[in-house]
């Protein structure tokens, strides 16, 4: 088994409207794809303090994920990440 997915929670930045929100997440998805990652899902989580969640498939390459996440800011602040094993 190896780590494969990252679930990142954060406080969504202030955007003017839903179109701007979609645009920012689309830019983040494009940047992830250029780094060899896949942004699978994004949305609003339930039952946690954060207002944003993304699920990223990094294909088991933790170094690739850490490099991307360290260099690229997302449309959120105050993030935390859980990693999920591929079974």
Which stretches of residues belong to each language-model region?
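Short S/T/G/P-rich N-terminal loop/turn motif that feeds into the first structured element of a domain
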Residues: 1-51, 57-67, 83-87
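A common structural junction motif
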Residues: 70-78
């Amino acid at each position: 088994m190896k780590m494969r997915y990252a679930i990142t929670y954060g406080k969504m930045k202030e955007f003017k409207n839903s179109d701007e929100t979609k645009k920012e997440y689309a830019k983040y998805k494009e940047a992830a794809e250029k780094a060899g990652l896949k942004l699978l899902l994004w949305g609003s989580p339930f039952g946690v303090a954060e207002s944003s969640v993304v699920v990223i498939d990094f294909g088991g390459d933790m170094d690739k994920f850490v490099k991307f996440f360290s260099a690229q800011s997302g449309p959120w602040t105050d993030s935390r990440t859980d990693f999920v094993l591929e079974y």
